[in-house]
Amino acid sequence: MRHRDSLGNDTTVNSGEVEYVTAGSGILQTSAFTPTEHLQSVRFWLNMPDSEKMNDPDYHIIKKEDTKYIEIDGAKITLLAGTLGDSEGYQGKHLPLDLYDVEMAANTTTVLPTPEDRSVMIFVMNGEIKAGGTAIPEKSVAKLSQGDRITIEASSDASFLVIGSLATNERVVWGNTIIMTNERDVEKAYHELEKGTFLKIQG
């Protein structure tokens, strides 16, 4: 995938890599995918605290060589960001983010550690699993309850993402890709887009 943005970045994100974008005070970007027979891409948003929303925007690619591979109870885990046990991956500049890509074979069980201070969710990309005894079908998201570990059972070959961070406990208001804590700031951002004053930092 080719990525271009208002910071001046013009890069290619390859298979197995992660682009880590901090929107901050504002960034405009385009993504163009190379034609291929099979493509699976996931994009999610991590809401920053209101006090950090106007920080400088930033862009970083987590390369495959910067990820770590871990095996727990037969589950093959790619540590993309954050920490897992004693292993550490890429650390963002703001909220802590734990991001794992997990593959499990059919009819296997694994227990993954989950920091008790984190809000954790699972996105099942392929197959079907049970988390804490609750079934999560393919292409579904489940938010986990608080605890220091979670038991995962795979009824078929499965792959899923585990995503964890600190909860901001703040109101979330969004308009398309503008995410704030109140309607006034969302309207202000769109007004700046119309006036051409949205971008505070450009490359």
What residue spans do the PLM features occupy?
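Jelly-roll (double-stranded beta-helix
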Residues: 1-203
